[in-house]
């Protein structure tokens, strides 16, 4: 496998990959491919951290021959944290503090649980740190993301919007890529608006979704809001 920056020629393939990776995972169907489609023109999008993982097969033993199939993708976004001024000792006096997030991160279903997602993420985190990105927060499964250095965001005094500040939020994770970047601060995070584009523009999303092959939407155990 090789990891490289996404190119315009990859867009449709990557969106289809994202759709396959998230279909019926968190809800019947998915919207992550539309989020990605719209995010590329969002000022919060970070093109230098827009990576694809491309399949490679062995050629004559001296060089690899790329067959062109993309099996993984991850994108990053600028974000911010609203500072809780009474508890922030960094001299900020309230306001907001720059941070970053990432996602969707997608691995084709045929390649899941084989280590490719962690390999892609770790590569991207190294590049993010090289760019000076000091803090990441995101929503995800700590069972997976702990292997890339993430822990509960509450341990860094970062709270999730609309959730009680005195409770740990098991899906809200964070990591300081640059030690001390977030020292002596406390604040509340709300995901960037770009992640809600499908909810805010349902007709546009449905028109976009109609350009893909039809797939069955299923209500399954483990999805958000699932009830027996």
Residue ranges of predicted features:
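Glycine-rich phosphate/pyrophosphate-binding loop shared by adenosine-nucleotide-utilizing enzymes
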Residues: 1, 67-73, 100
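Active-site rim helix/loop that mediates acceptor-substrate recognition in acyltransferases
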Residues: 15-66, 73-75, 80
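Glycine-biased, low-complexity coil/linker segments
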Residues: 89-91
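Acidic/histidine-enriched, glycine/proline-rich intrinsically disordered or flexible terminal extensions
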Residues: 179-228
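Hydrophobic adenine-recognition pocket in adenosine-nucleotide-binding enzymes
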Residues: 6, 105-107, 141
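Conserved acetyl-CoA pyrophosphate-binding loop and the N-cap/start of the following alpha-helix
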Residues: 102, 110-111, 115-123, 133
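A short beta-loop-alpha structural element at the N-terminal edge
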Residues: 2-14
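Conserved active-site alpha-helix within GNAT-family acetyltransferase domains
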Residues: 130-133, 140-165
């Amino acid at each position: 496998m090789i990891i490289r920056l996404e190119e315009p020629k990859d867009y449709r393939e990557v969106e289809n990959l994202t759709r396959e990776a998230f279909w019926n995972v968190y809800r019947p169907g998915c919207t992550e491919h539309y989020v990605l489609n719209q995010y590329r023109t969002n000022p919060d999008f970070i093109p230098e951290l827009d990576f694809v993982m491309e399949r490679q097969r062995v050629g004559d033993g001296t060089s690899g021959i790329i067959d062109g199939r993309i099996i993984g993708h991850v994108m990053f976004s600028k974000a911010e944290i609203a500072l809780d001024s009474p508890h922030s000792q960094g001299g900020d006096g309230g306001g907001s503090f720059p941070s970053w997030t990432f996602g969707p991160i997608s691995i084709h279903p045929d390649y899941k649980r084989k280590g490719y997602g962690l390999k892609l993420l770790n590569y991207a985190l190294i590049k993010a740190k090289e760019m000076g990105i000091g803090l990441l927060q995101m929503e995800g499964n700590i069972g997976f993301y702990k292997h890339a250095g993430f822990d509960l965001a509450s341990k860094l005094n970062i709270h999730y919007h609309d959730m009680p500040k005195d409770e740990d939020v098991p899906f809200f994770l964070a990591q300081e890529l640059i030690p001390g970047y977030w020292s002596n601060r406390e604040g509340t995070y709300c995901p960037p608006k770009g992640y809600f584009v499908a909810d805010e523009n349902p007709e546009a999303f449905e028109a976009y979704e109609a350009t893909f092959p039809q797939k069955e939407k299923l209500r399954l155990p483990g999805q958000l809001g699932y009830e027996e």
